[in-house]
Amino acid sequence: MNKSLSKNLRRYLCLTVTIVLSVSVSAQKDFSSIQTGVDVGDANIIESGVKSFEEIERRLPRRANSFDDDNSEHHATKGWGLDYEYYKYTYPTINTKGETIILTALAAMPTNYDVPINNIILGCHATITDNKSTPSEYIKSGDWKTDVGMLIMHAKSKSASELGYNCLVILPDYQGYGNTRYQAHPYLAQEITARQSVDALRYGIELYKKSKKGRAKIRDGWKTICVGYSQGGSVAMACHRFMETNFLDKDLHLGGSVCGDGPYDPIATMKFSVEEDKVFMPVAIPLILKGMLDYNPYMRRHKAKDYFTEKFLKTGILDWIELKEQNVLDIQKALRKFYKFHKDKRGDYLKASEIFTPEVFAFMSKKIKGEPTEKNPKFDDLYSALNVNNLTENWKPKYPIYLFHSKVDEVVPIGNAESAYQRMRTDKNPNIIKYTYVESGGHIMSGLAFFFAIFGKSYEQKAVEAIAGGERTWNLFNP
């Protein structure tokens, strides 16, 4: 090769490397630039350690007021991206009465401090009925194939260009789980769950900010992205809405939300169950009703017996929900001791008319058909309580939302996604909501399709990356 050409080529390569490194360094900022509006002194680390993405490692219980990094085990020692750092912490928030309560959450982050944090993922877990399935318990006995396991994968160390990885992941337990497991969970009480989850996010950021020097900075242009499936899908959307409507979107760099098969419209969900007279996940109905009876101002004057048949209540299902010892499948199995389940091509189900009293079933049947109903406080209050938690009403999002839904979801019908898309998008901003409707797969299989991909990237990962890249990548995103 010509010496002059070789020399110029070396200079060009050196200059290119210098520019790339310069851009890499300058395109970062310190976490101290993030304004959360909360005091880190009110939060506490109660457990921390390093866990492998390949195997469960030994817990390292500690206490602190920051994500401390002076532990030698808090660094990748098994190769690029094989470990993540976790922290279980408590933080203050409020309940439906405006009283201060202390909740738990889990934070996960890369062990490689040389690559900047790309984004912050607010991971919202799906419907659970047992405390062992909470995010903070995942570090002890969780299965990586669950939604929590998949959300934690965003903390995996990879190249800085992989915007779906190298993330700080915050996973709230929700009220009624973790250290409040003996309290009722406000199931589908969207605003309060969103408030509590966003508080977990804010305190998680503050704990990271107070860590010692050496921890990774965050990329310039980072986003907070709310992600979840099933109940987690609706909580993700509710958190998105809460940040927008409470002026937290700028400080927290809200990017948008990625929502899979979520019950955004409780009326649409109830309509499906009553019209078909089929409930494929029977525990969902008492979860919804119990949450409203415990926390909704419309419903506090009523009792469970006002809505459920005596036979259904005698199964002990409300006790199972309160104890939080049995998971959803355990409860489904326990109900078989009292009921003979029916079956169609989508799976096993109980009739809605076997769960609701005849009066409630008749009222709901008329209401969803638009037929006149007699005035009755306990029925009218039920409908009002369902409607007040409808995320698709009275809100036009300013930030992107990706909806994923199975057209044949037997638990959370496609009407939820259609309601969100039709009511929340506008002609002025038609691309603010994008969606993928898959042709097959019930609620469980749809969740696998959302988080997993045999080849290439999953729907969830592609949507996270589209939002993380900003307006240009979102506009190019064609799900």
Label every model-predicted segment:
Residues P266, K407-V412:
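Acidic catalytic loop of the alpha/beta-hydrolase fold
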Residues C239, Y399-P400, P413-M424:
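Short alpha-helix in the alpha/beta-hydrolase fold that links the catalytic acid
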Residues T96-T104, A108-E162:
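Short, surface-exposed "cap/lid" segments of acyl-processing enzymes
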Residues Q28-D114:
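Catalytic-loop region of hydrolases
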Residues G260-N394:
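Accessory cap/linker subdomain of secreted extracellular hydrolases
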Residues G149, Y187-S211:
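Alpha/beta-hydrolase active-site loop
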Residues K271, K378, Y383-L386, V411, ...:
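C-terminal catalytic histidine-bearing segment of alpha/beta-hydrolase fold enzymes
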Residues P397, Y402-D409:
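Short beta-strand/loop motif that positions the catalytic acidic residue
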